[in-house]
Amino acid sequence: MNHVNVEEVEEQPDTVISKFLVKSFTAFVLFDIGASHSYISRGFVDKYKLPTQALRSPMLVTSPGAEYMASLWCDRLPLRIGNYVFPSDLIVLESQGLDVILGMDWLSN
């Protein structure tokens, strides 16, 4: 994962960030081709009481300057982009700033 907050993203000319609806809630969403998986922040999950499930085994996620241990995920959360809805599997991270990071797993589908 290359970015974890909005300030980092805004400094990079080759990144795409926008606001989209995740299960009817507005979220800052980053499209990150450097991320192998897709993520959602713990704060966003808690704020909107989104359903989570335990990962089969915890996952170590690394980003520049930080490591996170992830143990939860959100199964098939609806992400609305324009008139299209994409069911999205998102790993829950204890990160701040960005609500959702869409990685190559999401972008390749």
Summary of predicted features, one role per range:
Residues 1-109:
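Acidic, Ser/Thr- and Pro-rich low-complexity intrinsically disordered regions characteristic
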